[in-house]
């Protein structure tokens, strides 16, 4: 009973740390965007559903792949945390670019088509990061002290990542559809 409570407390703590890293990455991205010398060359998006999907999905897929692979290594925990930081930076730069290029229409576009799906994807990435940290932490315990978690199940880990990847794909498809509709309505 005590061990279960301890594990739950560690899960809550790791989720809070991952959320903080994501927020710090978002703040860093906003500061970084503000320091850019010229944004006139920025191209926000393509005006097709597939164009919007192809702009957003590769980066989040790369982050998921990084989290998945790094979970199988005992020494990649900094990489797992850095992946969430990178997502926060890219999200903030994207939102800042929309605000800067389109003004109040960009604010409405961001409010309806970027933020809801970005929050969902952030949640899914935090869950993936937590699972990767858990598996790599148990591998670290096994490698360095010989007494890692004996109940580590790679099949369950892979299943969780498949489910989270499926949810992210659905979320990105919905985000692309909503983005396309908002572009037409707001004349962006």
Residue locations for each model-derived region?
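Conserved mixed alpha/beta catalytic, RNA-binding, or beta-rich assembly cores of soluble enzyme
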Residues: 75-103
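Interfacial loop-to-transmembrane junctions
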Residues: 142-165
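N-terminal signal-anchor transmembrane alpha helix
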Residues: 5-36
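Alpha-helical transmembrane segments of helical membrane proteins, especially in multi-pass transport
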Residues: 113-137, 168
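Cytosolic juxtamembrane amphipathic/interface segments immediately preceding
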Residues: 1-12, 67-68, 147-155
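Interfacial helix-start motif at the membrane-water boundary
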Residues: 48-76
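Final/C-terminal transmembrane alpha-helix of multipass membrane proteins
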Residues: 157-181
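Interfacial/capping segments of alpha-helical transmembrane domains
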Residues: 31-49
